[in-house]
Amino acid sequence: MVAFVKARRQIAGVKESKSLLPLALIGISLLYVGLIIIIPAANVAVQAFSEGLSGFIKNLGDRNLQEAIRLTLLMGVISVPLNTLFGLAAAFAIARKQFPGKSLLLSVIDLPFSISPVVAGLMIVLLYGRNGWLGPLLESNDIKIIFAWPGMALATIFVSMPFVAREVIPNLEEIGTDAEEAASTLGANGWQTFWRVTLPSIKWSMLYGVVLTTARALGEFGAVSVVSGSITGKTQTLPLFVEEAYKQYQTTLSYTAALLLGGISLVTLVLKALLEARTGRQSRIH
């Protein structure tokens, strides 16, 4: 009888410890996220409004901040469409064709994931800078790449290149070629097949890649910092402006710009979640 009671107590203790373990893990996770993300993000918002709403609006009117916003949006407008077109073309080549160097192309697409953005910026400087391979040719034709927006655009395009291709490739491989072959049999040409058959099947994964590309392009710091020189009012995107304003002890202005970047990140996160849910439903349907 005593042994039975001891066994019951041991079993109860094990059950209690098992029930406490998930709660402990949840608590640790929430504490970690709170310390690393939530509290710092909340502090940015508080500091941005430390001078009140009028001070926040005044900071938004800062000429250098507005120029940084304009340049940040310009980088997005240039890089996102180009990387979307490249991503679609590369995805079709990899998923639909067999050719020498296919594995190499896939590795090159993944290169921006593994290489440091600072190294990427340095690569662009060594190619297009005054002492670079193409520097003398560009200078003789009065074409400025480094310390100007074209170099910033090249850096942004490089770091945000893989996302559309990497999202569309598995989608194309999953849907196969049956529908495209059927459309071709019925007399549709290549463009008609793409617009009416293929694109509707990959649109959500493509949009998901576009959202990731946009987030990466607008938030890039390292590569753009190297090629731009971070000249206030001329070659500063929002991330560069945040750093420079903070170093110049314009803390409220810096937090205002950081809050704008945080707002962009929040919008991106919401769109990402919506597209993840949509692509999940689409995969279950297929």
UniProtKB/Swiss-Prot annotation:
Residue ranges annotated for the ABC transmembrane type-1 domain, each copy included: 69-272
One Pfam short name: BPD_transp_1
TM annotation in the entry: 20-40, 74-94, 108-128, 145-165, 207-227, 255-275
Classification via InterPro entries: CysW_permease (IPR011866), MetI-like (IPR000515), MetI-like_sf (IPR035906), Sulph_transpt2 (IPR005667)
Keyword ATP-binding belongs to the record: no
A GO molecular-function annotation: ABC-type sulfate transporter activity
Location(s), subcellular: Cell inner membrane
Membrane topology: Multi-pass membrane protein
Inducing factors: By sulfur deprivation.
Sorted UniProt keywords: Cell inner membrane, Cell membrane, Membrane, Stress response, Sulfate transport, Transmembrane, Transmembrane helix, Transport
The organism's place on the tree of life at top rank: Bacteria
Presence of the UniProt keyword Transmembrane helix in the record: yes
Any single Gene Ontology cellular-component annotation: plasma membrane
Its job: Part of the ABC transporter complex CysAWTP (TC 3.A.1.6.1) involved in sulfate/thiosulfate import. Probably responsible for the translocation of the substrate across the membrane.
Oligomeric form and interacting partners: The complex is composed of two ATP-binding proteins (CysA), two transmembrane proteins (CysT and CysW) and a solute-binding protein (CysP).
Family from the record: Belongs to the binding-protein-dependent transport system permease family. CysTW subfamily.
The name this protein goes by in its record: Sulfate transport system permease protein CysW
Lineage of producing organism: Bacteria, Bacillati, Cyanobacteriota, Cyanophyceae, Synechococcales
